[in-house]
Amino acid sequence: MYKRQDEANALYAQGYNIYSLFITISTAGIPSAISKLVAHYNGLNEYGVSQKLNRSALYMALASGVICGTVMMYIASWPIVYNGDTNLIPVLRSLAWAIFIIPLMAISRGIFQGYSMMAPSAISQFVEQLFRIIYMLGATYLIMKIQKGSWVSAVSQSTFAAFIGAIGACVVLCLAWLKYRGVMQGTGTIEQPVTEVSTTELILKIVYQSIPFIIIESGINLFQLIDQYSFKRMMPLVGHFTKYQIDVLYALFAFNANKLYMIIIALANALA
């Protein structure tokens, strides 16, 4: 793909910017909110409320995943979304599959963290990235080197790797739940009388806790989308550029450099 690498990177970046917005809408802040609330009720020995909270959060994640995934699948073919580049349609539809299950995965991680179990969350993240990278590299090699196929198909399979990674992470989380479900259900502990908390109240608490995260993360995604949808319109106004040149410049601007500084951010977060 090296001859089309910048075009491929530009297409990949465009798909992921839209995908990131849908992920933010469906999950932003909710795992952290779940973690805090579960830890709060467990600290009060109200494990029954924690279990009710877990169920409410999982139902909420399932609903948001189905809604956001379906919407993204449907609007992928809208001209206002693909912005004149029909290659973006299969990329968005391949990413939509991941949105169906990523909210469930993210909520499950938050639940484990609420029980002070960091290992399942960390292992699931490692497995997610491992599966994603293996599938991405394998599919790209198969399409480009063996089948001599389209670079657009290779990009679509590279983005579909997010779904494969999410499945791997969900398997790890399910196995962890089977192993620790006795602890998570409060087996062997003295439980306080269950506080009467309605499902609606629990959902409102989750939403209230997650609002700051949604605002901040959505803001970042929206700025990236503004760049994405204005870049191709603005560049012809400042020079004579072909579509290929614009794609190359966009890849340098929105993808290649981003991946380098994200390494620094990841290291800074780890040290913090």
Go through each PLM region and give its residues.
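Interfacial/gating helices of multi-pass transporter permease domains
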Residues: 3-20, 151, 155-156, 201-209, ...
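Short membrane-interface helical motifs at transmembrane helix boundaries
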Residues: 67-86
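Helix-loop junctions and terminal segments of transmembrane helices
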Residues: 28-43, 262-272
